[in-house]
């Protein structure tokens, strides 16, 4: 069997771990109807992991494609979700928390882009 045949299994297992980390972080951070801190935190954590580990350190060290796929697509994909960002956005909109909504979108999208940009420029 070729090692490429095991890539989906590695992605699957790493995604389960990423989802578990997401759940544990959401139970660790206090829930607030005013602002979705948990989603923002795990999305920033996912950006850091994706850029630092997958785009920087692991590629630089010549890590296998399977491990990079497992961590990037699997773990980071399970850790971060666009759907949670949208769900939190709709909740803030439905409850009339417009300032929190704008702040959340600015921090999520703008902050995420800035974090990815600056981490991506760094030479690991």
From Swiss-Prot:
Coiled coil: none annotated. GO terms for molecular function: fluoride channel activity; fluoride transmembrane transporter activity; metal ion binding. It is a multi-pass membrane protein. It comes from the Bacteria. It is found in: Cell membrane. Na(+) binds at residues 77, 80. GO terms for cellular component: plasma membrane. The keyword Transmembrane helix applies. It catalyses: fluoride(in) = fluoride(out). It holds the Pfam family CRCB. GO terms for biological process: cellular detoxification of fluoride; fluoride transmembrane transport. The keyword Nuclease does not apply. Belongs to the fluoride channel Fluc/FEX (TC 1.A.43) family. This is Fluoride-specific ion channel FluC 2. It comes from Streptococcus pneumoniae (strain ATCC BAA-255 / R6). The gene is fluC2.
